[in-house]
Amino acid sequence: MPLLDSFTVDHTRMNAPAVRVAKTMQTPKGDTITVFDLRFTAPNKDILSEKGIHTLEHLYAGFMRNHLNGDSVEIIDISPMGCRTGFYMSLIGTPSEQQVADAWLASMEDVLKVESQNKIPELNEYQCGTAAMHSLEEAQQIAKNILAAGVSVNKNDELALPESMLKELRVD
């Protein structure tokens, strides 16, 4: 099985909250797709609550689009990581890590402005696969934590696992 890019970086050295360019690729028509690792918590040290990350999934995707989409950037998708330490964001364009960090912080401010659970978009059984698993309070606590900590940048070259270690860790 091929080694995915996200598994070539040392998760024990990742800062959080932090933005990282996880991957860039060119489409056949020449557009650049950039995938960002939006790391909310330090891997293997903390985890986002189920209800909190699920509610953020509903709120964050819209808020990030409001703050980052423009003439040269269009967000394709923002999805929570299975490890529940953050989100992956795929987009067309090449915004800087600082632009992404600024949009992230502005989005967290927006999360704090949501007044009640019934203001969460698509929170119903028709548009959400687990409509009962939400907590605006938990999502707002996550947002407060991000705003208090600020958002830094993780660089791939600083986190790259040595080839020898990748070979040693490989499961055949």
Swiss-Prot record:
Q: How is the cofactor bound?
A: Binds 1 Fe cation per subunit.
List the catalysed reactions: S-(5-deoxy-D-ribos-5-yl)-L-homocysteine = (S)-4,5-dihydroxypentane-2,3-dione + L-homocysteine
**Under which main EC class is this enzyme filed?**
lyase
| UniProt-listed GO biological process terms | quorum sensing
What does the record give as the function of this protein? Involved in the synthesis of autoinducer 2 (AI-2) which is secreted by bacteria and is used to communicate both the cell density and the metabolic potential of the environment. The regulation of gene expression in response to changes in cell density is called quorum sensing. Catalyzes the transformation of S-ribosylhomocysteine (RHC) to homocysteine (HC) and 4,5-dihydroxy-2,3-pentadione (DPD).
Alphabetized PANTHER family for the sequence: S-RIBOSYLHOMOCYSTEINE LYASE (PTHR35799:SF1)
HAMAP family reported for this sequence: LuxS
Q: Which protein is depicted?
A: S-ribosylhomocysteine lyase
Q: List the gene name.
A: luxS
